[in-house]
Amino acid sequence: YYSSNNESYYASLNPGVNIGSWRLRNSGIWMKGYDGESEYQNSYIYAERDIRSLKSKLLLGESSTGSEIFDSVPFKGVRLSTSDNMIPYLERTFVPTVRGVANSVAQVDVRQNGYIIYSTEVPAGPFALSDIPAAEGSDMEVTVTEDNGSVQRFTVPYNAPAISIKSGSLKYDVTFGKYRPYYNVSRKGNFSHFTIIYGFNDLLTGYTGVQASNNYFSGAIGFGFNFNELGAVSLDGIYSKDGYNNDEDGSAVRVRYKNLLSETNTTFDIASYQYASKNYSTFADAMEKSMRHSYDWKKKNDTSIRIRQSFSDYGLLDLSLNKTTYWNKKDESYAAFNYSTLLLRNISFTVGWNKYFDSYYSDQEDVFSASISVPFGKMINSGSANLRYQIINERDDSISNSVSLNGMAYNNRLAWNVTQSVNSKEHNNNRTSLSSSLKNSFGTMNAMYNHSHMVTQYGGGINGSIVLHDKGITFGQRITGAAALIDTDGSENITVLNKPGVITDSNGFAIVTGLGSYRKNDIYLEQSKISSDTSIDKTISSVVPTDSALVRAKYSTMKGSKAILKLLDRNNVPIAFGSVVSVQDKSSTGIVGDDGRVYMSGLDGSGILKVQWGKNSQEQCQIPYTLKNKKSLGLYSETLKCM
């Protein structure tokens, strides 16, 4: 029996500085593996600003080119391009969901162009990752590392949809820089990238582009057609000449189709790349040639199909197919099927199937899974809770059964999960897993425990943000995109509505993340959570941030007691309806209602009220007050008389 203790650590750092219109951003990942070796990988650093008159962005530093026409290329240099965030929300492109099946608590890493762009931990069973910050046009390489060290790898194609934009619309991308390789042995060199897309009318879109360096050239031309209900089709041809490899030249033809059939709620995405000659190469192919050697497989055809079918109340079907043929290698194919629905309105049922086949290595993976989830939190009065059963047909033809209990608590701040898995063949793979995460105003804490016959794992982590601003330092949850700095004039412990765990700190600040750029965002404070000694004129603030901006959401608050006062004049007659009441040396005011009653907030324990019901001195008075009679809901009730 072999026993060992191993530790691994992971930290993702994403510092940023906003100075006027400029956004300075950096991303890096530090890892220390089980072997004790540590590594820091700098993903990118750049400065960027919006140019509103051009609906564009100017970027200086490290990033990747656009990918509507050519494959995305990592670079270090300068880029001026149309900003997608300035395009109406419904016309934006979204990243495909990465789906897979983990056999245990596993680490999932997603790479693009060799760089890790996303890393997370998933529980055993099917997973779906939809918030990956990928660059369109480059495949995503997914690595799933199980708790026993076994690794499964697969690729998720990320093909740009059919190119078709509205009449008169213009999109462009101009980049000058140096190729930024992941591998140190790759070729290095300056290059330029230029693409332009123009909508001639509602039917026809034209586009062209060039990628060039001292030893490489590629040119493309194509047209996109918008057939409305019949969908959008784009057809283009690309020519390349590789001076790094004896001036080999080649060409490729690409057809892309995208359509949404609104009558049937069916979405089609089809892309086919036909490489007319073996010598065609992308810019990355030419620059990475030294890394390929004997495994330099040349693609002949690459076809991907995705169909999403909504059945309204009867569920959602998602089908993906991909087949790649090579000039000098046998075929590869990948298929994924997923269907989910609700039974009896609240019981969730999901069935999935993933298949990968590489005929060259005779390597085949075939995984089937099914699960059913039953909510019962209301039965035991414990927030939301679900009991879930899942069965998986593993790659080794064994059957894994698992039962899990998961749910949310503390106003959706706490997420928890307990899972027990049993394998039909290998009882050493039976596992018990526990995991939880807790959202706070300063971030999200998570913890996990995983035990099997051979392995015991436990770990924890925290992610969040630290914001330095003109009034101090504020901790918050992880910032994604634009964010708002909540400012409540020093009022603490105020909850932001529909943002679990976001509460103002001792200085009255909080961070709200995930705001939409270039559109109105309404941020509400939760009225029921405001303390009895705090008053807020308006519990809503509306902001329209630019991309990656940090905007201030200001709320006018007053500290002090609240009271319903009955005011009498010198003759013990109730003060007239509509009279104005103010507090000496404070901004608190009120209007007298029926029977001389007025609601006031922001009051000290004692003070002087000024009451005015006319212009002359006989139509106003002062009333000293002391708050003594506190009623329910934190309200005081007093009867006061003019002096």
What residues fall within each predicted segment?
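Conserved structural position at the C-terminal beta-strand
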Residues: V144, V611-W613
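Compositionally biased low-complexity segments at domain edges in trafficked proteins
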Residues: S167-I196, Y555-S582, S637-M643
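Short, acidic Ser/Thr/Gly-rich low-complexity loop/linker segments typical of extracellular
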Residues: G501-F509, K586-R597
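Extracellular beta-sheet/turn segments enriched in Thr/Pro/Gly and aliphatic residues
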Residues: A160-K166, G476, T539-K559, P624-M643
